[in-house]
Each structure stands twice: as structure tokens, then as C-alpha cells.
Amino acid sequence: MRVILLGAPGAGKGTQAQFITEEFGIPQISTGDMLRAAVKAGSEMGLKAKAVMDAGQLVSDDIIIGLVKERLTQDDCANGALFDGFPRTIPQADALKDAGVEIDYVVEIDVADEEIVKRMSGRRVHEASGRTYHLVYNPPKVEGKDDVTGEDLVQRADDTEETVRLRLGVYHDQTAPLIGYYQDWLKADSATAPKFVKVNGIGDLNEIKQSLLASLKA
């Protein structure tokens, strides 16, 4: 089973990705990890990518697609793979399609922007230990203080409302159009298009997992 996972930053893709990979025994493939591994291994596509990166340029979609095809031939992908953060744009999705890389499911984890802002901007962290709290869902016993040490909690720069909204803006501009892309492909050609699954990412974690599992096994 080959799955593309879509959803805004903070929608809970990481949690669901881990669940899917464990449930179906497939690896999670991110383009960053794939690039690093190919460069380290000195594969043909890895050497091409290294030459581009060494020149300070962006790795082209053609090279990324080549790396994807190369990665899918490895033993751990025999049962499929989960694509994390790829494709990110319509041109990448087109390139994947044109290269004949078959995808079984596209899964969208659907969470409204305001819920994501609430989730992420409410996070507070004890930097020394990495303990994480949330002002609404998991507040510390004493406001602004770590439960164990009593030291101050901080809000990471990535979690400020301004930063979260900026990241959501990038997602809506670049990646959200993929949802329409795959839905339109399915309407036009259901024989070759991946099945599209939309999962509500708000609510009890186990219920979300069961809903996702039922859709992928349907």
C-alpha cells in the first residue's frame, strides 16, 4: 500500500503516519531523509542531487522523482510506503503521475485553521527536559512553571500565533491545492487515480485512528 498523507502543519499527521506505518508494516519516506541517504550511499541519483546541492541550487523535481523510484525498489518498500511531505506542489504531483509511480491512497487529515492555531499557540515547553504542556489541554499545575522543577516554561518561536498563521498560509498556497488535484483526478479517471480519504482530525485519538483504518481497509 502506497499512501500520500496531506494535512496542515499541526493537524496531527505525525501521529497518524506512525500509526499507518506500524499497522501496515511500511516505511515512512520523507524527501529530506531520502536525499541524505542517497547522497551517503553514493547512488546515481544521490550523486546527481549532491552535485546540485554543492552548487547551492535547489534539487529539481526530476531528481526527487528519480530518488522516489529508486527508494521504492528497496526491500522495506515491498508492501508499500507512506510519503511524508511529498508531493508538496501540483508540479511535483504531476511529475509523480507522469513517472508512473502508482499511489493507492491519498489521505487528508482535516483540521480547521483556528483549531490548529489553538493547538500550537497554546504549547509551552520546559527547555531543559523537553517536557511539553498546553494551556488548555494539558496545563501545568502552576501557571507558567514546570511541574517537576518549578522552572519557567517558554513558548517556542515556531508556536507563536503569528508563525503558525504564516505556516498555514504557505500550506494553503502550495499544498492544499493537491486535495483538489487528487479529487479531480479521481472523478476523471477512477481506474488509475488513488482513492481519496478525508479524515476528521479533531476528537479522540483512537476514534481518529479507527476511522482512518476503516477507510484504508475498505
Curated annotation (Swiss-Prot):
Task: Please indicate which superkingdom the organism of origin belongs to.
Answer: Bacteria
Q: State a single Pfam family of this protein.
A: ADK
Region NMP: which residues?
30-59
Show the segment(s) annotated as LID: 122-159
Q: Which reaction does it catalyse?
A: AMP + ATP = 2 ADP
* Entries under PROSITE patterns matching the protein: ADENYLATE_KINASE
Q: Which CDD domains match?
A: ADK
> EC number(s) of the enzyme?
2.7.4.3
Q: Which family does it belong to?
A: Belongs to the adenylate kinase family.
How does this polypeptide assemble, per the annotation? Monomer.
- Name it: Adenylate kinase
Per the UniProt record, the source organism is: Marinomonas sp. (strain MWYL1)
The top of its lineage is: Bacteria, Pseudomonadati, Pseudomonadota, Gammaproteobacteria, Oceanospirillales
**What gene is it encoded by?**
adk
